[in-house]
């Protein structure tokens, strides 16, 4: 839920519900790590809406959250007013997946958050060339916690790596284009980082071809993922919210 920390101040007047998916943040870890999949996580989101007595919502999905949003559009389209996909599409580039597997589920090799922030800043300087260190320092606090015995700790169940590896090995990848097509009949915005290694320009064009009314925005000097407080991101989000209010 901390992924939306930079966006939240720009959505005054809107009710914001930012959930920690199972096994992340302050949510409990699942007994069965195979439940870390987009269908189960989407069901969790619907159960949260039920608990809050919310009939329909506009969903903003960043990265994996966007995959969950696509799944929801097929499983529970009646619950969605519209959607924003942040740097994710039905074709996920292998280069980006490989980069994610370099760190997912692993204990970060840093002594403290300051060292971690410097490493993150150095690692993202090509894809995010104009982002000041202070932003990366804040982003680091969203991503990790100080560990009690020193060093830093991830804020999610390390077995997420096992779930992702198992799904890939078993060939359980969903037909994401079929899921994406579930968004055809509702307002949709898609945001892409110009330097993204997960959402290619070619996939972005295909998305527009299949959803001609989609609000499509490319954010300069951003990789995976835009922070969502960039002017281009905010313009797309507010335009979408105008359609769903």
Name every feature range the model reports, one short phrase each.
Residues 17-24, 89, 220-223:
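Short beta-to-alpha linker loops that shape the active-site pocket of alpha/beta-hydrolase fold enzymes
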Residues 55-96:
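Conserved hydrolase catalytic core segment
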């Amino acid at each position: 839920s901390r992924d939306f920390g930079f966006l939240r101040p720009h959505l005054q007047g809107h009710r914001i519900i930012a959930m920690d998916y199972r096994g992340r943040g302050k949510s409990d870890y699942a007994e069965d790590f195979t439940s870390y999949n987009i269908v189960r996580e989407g069901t969790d989101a619907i159960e949260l809406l039920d608990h809050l007595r919310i009939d329909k919502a506009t969903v903003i999905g960043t990265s994996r959250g966007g995959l969950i949003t696509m799944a929801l559009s097929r499983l529970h389209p009646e619950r969605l007013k519209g959607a924003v996909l942040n740097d994710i599409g039905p074709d996920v580039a292998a280069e980006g997946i490989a980069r994610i597997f370099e760190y997912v589920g692993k204990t970060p090799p840093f002594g403290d958050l300051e060292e971690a922030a410097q490493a993150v800043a150095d690692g993202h300087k090509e894809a995010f060339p104009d982002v000041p260190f202070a932003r990366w320092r804040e982003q680091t606090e969203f991503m990790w916690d100080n560990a009690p015995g020193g060093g830093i700790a991830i804020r999610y169940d390390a077995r997420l790596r096992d779930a992702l590896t198992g799904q890939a090995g078993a060939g359980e990848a969903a037909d994401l284009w079929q899921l994406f097509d579930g968004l055809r009949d509702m307002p949709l915005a898609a945001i892409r980082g110009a330097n993204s290694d997960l959402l290619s320009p070619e996939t972005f064009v295909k998305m527009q071809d299949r959803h001609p009314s989609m609000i499509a925005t490319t954010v300069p000097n951003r990789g995976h993922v835009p922070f969502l407080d960039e002017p281009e991101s905010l313009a797309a989000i507010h335009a979408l919210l105008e359609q769903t209010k």
